[in-house]
Design a protein with these regions (language model features):
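Elongated alpha-helical scaffolds that mediate protein-protein interactions in large eukaryotic proteins
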Residues: 1-151, 162-194, 232-245, 305-308, ...
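Long, compositionally biased acidic/polar linker segments
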Residues: 195-201, 208, 248-251, 255-310, ...
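Eukaryotic scaffolding regions of large macromolecular assemblies
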Residues: 263-483
């Protein structure tokens, strides 16, 4: 049963769900009082949680209260970070993460303060990493509020990835970042955030997928965070640990930050990712991950989740399962049935749901030659059957090509185009060689490449191995021998000419074609053709 304090704070929270109620709670005095109550009733989790939920409601409804909460005399950000560092209860972590996410979403200056200072002697990045590893174990054990807590903690982490590098502008990731005054995600990076990458990769590589759509929270928020972290030379051994482990016999899988606190609610399984091997079906691979996660409950007293996983393999598996769910067989991506499947999703468009995962794969391929070669072999293997139109295939290659002509899913269309372009080494000629210029033309036109690219002298061996002399450069399919048809008779030729004359005359009369652009009229005026014998 709830204590009297919990009941009173529950009633206060109910009043704070309305704008007028939250306006009263948003004053410095009320926010400080609620923080004090959450600390005073630390041995009463229900009462402490209700006090924090009152604050969360006020921050959500009264935007001006967010800065009030962070600055003196409240100093709520520091108090909540210290509480987060100590907490092992998913319900309390959820509310604390929600408060910290809301209070820092639009205030990047305080993000800098959080990064530069330590909290209970620990950097905030280390605290977030430890809590993510703890919550991963809780998610595997289906602990109440574990998924929600991880989702909001990931949102809080994303605020750091989004705001801090732009605020300090330490390491520009491209020439455009230095020249463009408008800074966007990925233009800059700070080594102080490097510690976020290992726990994010551990969760991305091991979190059991959902079915039939595998891209659901908190996995969606992991992907959003990952695409904001550069695949830079200094971080490549973290992005691709299995590769560095092979190259360096002394290297070992990186362990997560130990929290030195255990909670019987969560358990603490060990989760090891197997090395990449032959590729079974995507659905079978996803099921095996889910089964492995369930078998691993409560094996030890401290979380140990290996980050030695294949990030590209995992991302491609998830995309393959998602594409097979939304674009079954060879359905048109713009078919209304596709949009019907989104009714059960938290996202209202495939652009928002799938584009981030495609962007993650693209960034891996842009930064890593091995990833490009692997993606090419999965999408366009050397022994690809090119007898039938490529865009009619039922596999991932065909689905990707059909998306290039989508009208309804513009962001996803562009993202898939960039992924194919990265797979081809960011070379228009290589892309046209692999998928046919007819399939690539629309994407290349939007990139400012307005004509068919010439054969590239830099075509790499992987692309060259996919090219055969009998492949049509426009369709990407093999040439078919022309049937031996009899020559047209003179009478048939005259009939075809009459059809052309009639068509062009009709276009001219309807105003669709100016008279001076009629090719038949021009030919007659130039003496190159006559109307009759």
């Amino acid at each position: 049963m709830l204590s009297d304090a919990a009941k009173a704070l529950l009633a206060l929270k109910s009043l704070g769900r309305h704008q007028s109620g939250s306006e009263i709670l948003a004053s410095p005095e009320k926010l400080s009082a609620l923080l004090s109550l959450s600390t005073l009733y630390k041995d009463d989790p229900d009462a402490s949680s209700e006090a924090l939920r009152c604050i969360a409601n006020a921050l959500l409804l009264i935007q001006s209260s967010r800065e009030t909460f962070l600055k003196p005399p409240v100093n709520g950000g520091e108090i909540c970070l210290n509480a987060l560092e100590k907490s092992t209860n998913p319900e309390q972590i959820f509310v604390l993460a929600r408060i910290l996410f809301l209070s820092t979403a639009l205030l990047p200056d305080y993000i800098v303060t959080f990064i530069e200072n330590k909290h209970n002697g620990r950097p905030v990045v280390e605290i977030i990493g430890a809590k993510l590893d703890l919550l991963y174990i809780c998610v595997l054990n289906s602990t109440r509020m574990a998924k929600e807590a991880m989702t909001d903690l990931l949102k809080f982490a994303y605020n750091f990835i989004h705001h801090y590098p732009k605020a300090v502008q330490e390491n520009p990731q491209s020439q455009a970042a230095e020249e463009d005054e408008k800074k966007v995600l990925g233009d800059y990076w700070s080594p102080k955030l490097d510690g976020l990458l290992p726990p994010l990769l551990r969760i991305f590589g091991s979190l059991p997928p959902s079915f039939p759509n595998p891209i659901t929270p908190p996995l969606t928020h992991v992907i959003h965070a990952l695409i904001g972290i550069p695949v830079s030379p200094s971080l490549k051994n973290v992005w691709f640990p299995s590769r560095s482990a092979v190259n360096s016999p002394k290297s070992a899988p990186q362990t997560p930050h130990s929290d030195h606190r255990s909670d019987s609610r969560c358990g603490s399984p060990i989760m090891q990712s197997p090395p990449p091997s032959a590729r079974p079906g995507a659905f079978d691979r996803a099921l095996s991950v889910l089964s492995a996660g369930r078998r691993s409950f409560s094996r030890c007293s401290s979380p140990h989740v290996s980050s030695n996983s294949d990030i590209l393999h995992r991302a491609w598996d998830l995309l393959e399962v998602a594409f097979n769910h939304f674009f079954a067989d060879n359905i048109d991506p713009d078919d209304p049935k596709v949009r019907e499947l989104l009714k059960d999703s938290s996202d209202n468009s495939l652009d928002a749901l799938l584009s981030p995962l495609v962007i993650l794969i693209t960034r891996l391929c842009q930064a890593d030659e091995t990833s490009r070669a692997r993606l090419k072999q999965w999408l366009v293997p050397d022994d690809l059957d090119r007898e039938s139109p490529l865009e009619q295939r039922q596999d991932m290659f065909g689905k990707s090509l059909r998306l290039l002509t989508s009208v309804y899913h513009n962001r996803l269309k562009d993202s898939v185009g960039e992924m194919l372009y990265a797979m081809a080494g960011s070379d228009a000629s290589n892309l046209s060689t692999l998928i046919g210029y007819g399939n690539a033309a629309g994407f290349l036109f939007n990139k400012g490449i307005l004509s068919a690219p010439p054969a590239s002298s830099s075509t790499n061996g992987d692309v060259a191995s996919s090219v055969r002399d009998d492949i049509n450069p426009i369709t990407g399919t093999t040439f078919k021998p022309k049937p031996n048809l009899p020559e047209m008779t003179e009478e048939e030729k005259e009939q075809e000419v009459e059809k052309l004359l009639w068509l062009f005359d009709r276009l001219e009369k309807t105003g669709a074609m100016p008279a001076d652009q009629n090719p038949i009229r021009k030919a007659i005026q130039d003496g190159k053709a006559t109307l009759g014998p």
